[in-house]
C-alpha cells in the first residue's frame, strides 16, 4: 500500500489509535488540579464582557462526546478551546483547522500516542499534517510558560489565529495546561483589540509584525501590556524602535516552527542592534547547523513527523531540520535566509503549488508558476508573484478577477508576469 510506504517513516503500527494512556493521564491530572484550584475563576473572557469559568469550561467539554476517530477544532477562540479540551479529556486526537480552510485528511493514520494534529504549510511550501503527543505539546507550552513568565503576566489576548502554532501555544494551550486565562479578541483591528484588553489590569499580547505595525500606527493603547511578543516573520528594527519611542513598549522577537515549537527569543529589555537577531535558545532546546547551513533543532517538543514526508527531510525522534539558514553568534541565533519554497505573507505561510492550482482551475490556463519575492513592505515579508504562459497584454483586470476567483484574499498575487 502506498500509504504504508509513506508512513513507514514513523516506525509505528499503521492503525488509528487514541492518545496514549500515560499522556492522557498526565493531562487529566493537570487539568483536574487546575479546575480544583481555580474552578470559579475565569478561563476565557468573551468579546461581550462575559466570562467562562474553568468549572464551566470543564462541564461543557465533558458534555461534548467525540463521535469519530478525531475532533475537528475549527472556529473562533471559544469553539477551539472547548473542542481541544473535549478531545484531550476523551483521549481523541484533535486536528486544528483554520476557519476558512477545509480539513486535510492525513495521508496515513496518526502514529501511536497522537493527541494533536496540525495542518500547516511551513517553510517547505507543502501543506501537510504534523502529529504530536501530549508530552510534546506540554514541553512547548511549559517551555514558553517558564521562560516568558506567563504565569505572572495576566491574561493572554488571542488576537491572532489559535489554529496557528504561535497563537495556539501562547493562548488557549496555556489555559488548558497551566490555567492562564485567555481573552478573546474577535478581530485583530484596533478597536476590537482595545475593547478586549481594557477590562484587564495586565495582559500579554502575541502578534505578527504586520499586526504590530497596524497596532502601533493606530490608536491602540498599550498601558496594560506586560509582555509584547512577535513571531511568524522577522521583526524589523524600525518597528521595534517605533514601539519603544512611541509607546515605551519592548516587542520581544520569538522564533520557532510549527514542527518543533518555540526555539529562541529576544530576552533583552532594549532594542536589538541587528534585525537578524533571533535571541537566545529557550531552555531545553539544542541547535546546530547542518552542512547546508540550515538550523537543526533538537528538543522534547519536536513532533512525531509528517503524514507525507519528503525525500531528504529530517523530522521526528526529537530532531527537526528547518528550512532556515541560521548563523550562531555566540549564544544568540542570527537569521540569514529561508531556503524553503513556502511563501511568507505577513506571517502566514502559503503553498505556491496550492495557489498555482487554484489559478489554473479558475483561468483554465496550464502554464502557471508561483513564487515569493521580497516585499517593499518589510512587515509583509514577501509578495506573491505569478508567472503565466500568456502574453502580458492579456493579463488585464478582467483576467485577474477570473484567475483569482478561487483564491483567499491573502493568496492573490501582487505581481503578474506574462510573455512579452
Predicted features and spans:
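ATP-dependent adenylate-forming carboxylate-activation enzymes
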Residues: 75-76, 92-105, 180-200, 209-210, ...
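Conserved AMP-binding/adenylate-forming
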Residues: 23, 27, 65-100, 159-161, ...
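Conserved AMP-binding/adenylate-forming core of the ANL superfamily
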Residues: 20-33, 37-67, 102, 108, ...
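Gly/Ser/Thr-rich phosphate-binding loop
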Residues: 204-206, 216-273, 286-288
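Conserved AMP-binding A3 loop
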Residues: 115-142
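Conserved AMP-binding/adenylation subdomain of ANL enzymes
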Residues: 141-155, 163-204
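Conserved ATP/PPi-binding loop(s) of AMP-dependent carboxylate-activating enzymes
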Residues: 280-281, 288-319, 338, 350
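AMP-binding/adenylate-forming catalytic core of the ANL superfamily
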Residues: 299, 318, 323-417
Amino acid at each position: 500500500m502506498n500509504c504504508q510506504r509513506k508512513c513507514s517513516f514513523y516506525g509505528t503500527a499503521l492503525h488509528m489509535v487514541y492518545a496514549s494512556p500515560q499522556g492522557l493521564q498526565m493531562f487529566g491530572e493537570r487539568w483536574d488540579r487546575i479546575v480544583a484550584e481555580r474552578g470559579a475563576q475565569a478561563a476565557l473572557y468573551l468579546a461581550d464582557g462575559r466570562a467562562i469559568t474553568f468549572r464551566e469550561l470543564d462541564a461543557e467539554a465533558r458534555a461534548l462526546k467525540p463521535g469519530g476517530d478525531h475532533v475537528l477544532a475549527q472556529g473562533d477562540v471559544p469553539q477551539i478551546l472547548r473542542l481541544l479540551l473535549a478531545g484531550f479529556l476523551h483521549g481523541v486526537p484533535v486536528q486544528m483547522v483554520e476557519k476558512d480552510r477545509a480539513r486535510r485528511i492525513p495521508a496515513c493514520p496518526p502514529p501511536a500516542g497522537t493527541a494533536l494534529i496540525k495542518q500547516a504549510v511551513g517553510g517547505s511550501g507543502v501543506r501537510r499534517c504534523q502529529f504530536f503527543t501530549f508530552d510534546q505539546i506540554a514541553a512547548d507550552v511549559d517551555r514558553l510558560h517558564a521562560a516568558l513568565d506567563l504565569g505572572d503576566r495576566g491574561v493572554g489576548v488571542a488576537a491572532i489565529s489559535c489554529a496557528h502554532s504561535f497563537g495556539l501555544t501562547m493562548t488557549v494551550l496555556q489555559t488548558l495546561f497551566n490555567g492562564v486565562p485567555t481573552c478573546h479578541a474577535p478581530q485583530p483591528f484596533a478597536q476590537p483589540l482595545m475593547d478586549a484588553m481594557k477590562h484587564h489590569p495586565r495582559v500579554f499580547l502575541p502578534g505578527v509584525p504586520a499586526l504590530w505595525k497596524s497596532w502601533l500606527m493606530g490608536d491602540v493603547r498599550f498601558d496594560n501590556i506586560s509582555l509584547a511578543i512577535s513571531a511568524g516573520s522577522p521583526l524589523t528594527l524600525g518597528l521595534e524602535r517605533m514601539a519603544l519611542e512611541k509607546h515605551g513598549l519592548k516587542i520581544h522577537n520569538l522564533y520557532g516552527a510549527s514542527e518543533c515549537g518555540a526555539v529562541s527569543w529576544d530576552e533583552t529589555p532594549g532594542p536589538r542592534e541587528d534585525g537578524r537577531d533571533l535571541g537566545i535558545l529557550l531552555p531545553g532546546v539544542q541547535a546546530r547547523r547542518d552542512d547546508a547551513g540550515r538550523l537543526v533543532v533538537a528538543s522534547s517538543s519536536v513532533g512525531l513527523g509528517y503524514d507525507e514526508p519528503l525525500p531528504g527531510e529530517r523530522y521526528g525522534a526529537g530532531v527537526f531540520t528547518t528550512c532556515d539558514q541560521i548563523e550562531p553568534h555566540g549564544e544568540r541565533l542570527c537569521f540569514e535566509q529561508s531556503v524553503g519554497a513556502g511563501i511568507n505573507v505577513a506571517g502566514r505561510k502559503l503553498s505556491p503549488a496550492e495557489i498555482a492550482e487554484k489559478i489554473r482551475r479558475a483561468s483554465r490556463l496550464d502554464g502557471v508558476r508561483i513564487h515569493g519575492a521580497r516585499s517593499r513592505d518589510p512587515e509583509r515579508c514577501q509578495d506573491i508573484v505569478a508567472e503565466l504562459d500568456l502574453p502580458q497584454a492579456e493579463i488585464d483586470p478582467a483576467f485577474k478577477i477570473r484567475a483569482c476567483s478561487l483564491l483567499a484574499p491573502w493568496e492573490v498575487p501582487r505581481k503578474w508576469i506574462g510573455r512579452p
